[in-house]
């Protein structure tokens, strides 16, 4: 079984002890080392909001964007995102078929941890990317999607599980790590390809979180589909996000 190997660079920041995580696909963006701000990953995890967000009913990408926004707003931490893409072998979850899952990730002393607070019954603390992949895909035989692998990136627009076997080999799942501002798989694809799902050129960069997107994500994360139709959550999200 192949282990999760994250393609990152560790760069020394202004502090002699800071180890910022720089992602290969996003070389101009750094994931903050929380230790330089006096934070511990366990404390940050315990403070993640699970009261406003409907943890059991919300979509992972919506709550992940809100939590990434919270890290930036409350602790001035630039968190990343870890996107997992399933194959037919790994995407069956009970009666459902998942094609992707996403969690915020943070950097502590140069090591990355998944902060998936959406499953309070089974995840009670930060876990390593390997542990997270094993938990949600049942495997760590996962391929990292690189910026030049356009055929794999284009699949992010489709909404279907990935093939196990491609020209890159045979894998149980795929993953990519992004800045925290990338909301959905489609947004990741737009950013890397420079085109939308119709092939039209776009300039889409989310090194910072977009306020309109996090507001929309919040409304969807705190209400049911019926509640959204009735306008539920809008006031709560504006107040909570400070927008």
Model-assigned labels for residue ranges:
Residues 1-4:
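Positively charged n-region of N-terminal signal peptides that target proteins for export
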Residues 13-18:
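N-terminal signal peptide c-region/cleavage motif recognized by signal peptidases
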Residues 19-243:
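A structural boundary/capping signal
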Residues 6-8:
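Sec-dependent N-terminal signal peptides
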């Amino acid at each position: 079984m192949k282990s999760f190997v994250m393609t990152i660079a560790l760069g020394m920041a202004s502090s002699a002890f800071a180890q910022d995580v720089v992602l290969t696909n996003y070389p101009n963006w750094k994931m903050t080392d929380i230790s330089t701000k006096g934070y511990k990953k366990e404390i940050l995890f315990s403070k993640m909001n699970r009261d406003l967000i409907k943890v059991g009913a919300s979509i992972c990408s919506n709550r992940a964007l809100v939590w990434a926004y919270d890290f930036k707003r409350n602790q001035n931490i630039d968190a990343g995102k870890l996107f997992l893409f399933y194959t037919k072998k790994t995407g069956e979850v009970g009666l459902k078929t998942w094609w992707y899952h996403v969690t915020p990730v943070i950097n502590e002393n140069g090591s990355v941890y998944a902060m998936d607070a959406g499953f309070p019954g089974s995840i009670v603390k930060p876990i390593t990317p390997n542990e997270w992949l094993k938990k949600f895909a049942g495997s760590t035989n996962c391929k990292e999607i690189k910026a030049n692998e356009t055929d794999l990136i284009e699949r992010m627009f489709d909404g279907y599980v990935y093939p196990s076997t491609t020209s890159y080999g045979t894998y149980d799942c795929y993953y990519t790590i992004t800045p925290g501002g990338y909301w959905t798989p489609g947004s990741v694809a737009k950013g890397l390809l420079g085109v939308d799902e119709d092939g039209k050129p776009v300039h889409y960069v989310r090194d910072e979180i977009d306020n309109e997107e996090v507001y929309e994500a919040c409304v969807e994360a705190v209400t049911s589909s019926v509640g959204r139709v009735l306008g539920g959550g809008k006031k709560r999200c504006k107040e909570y996000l400070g927008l």
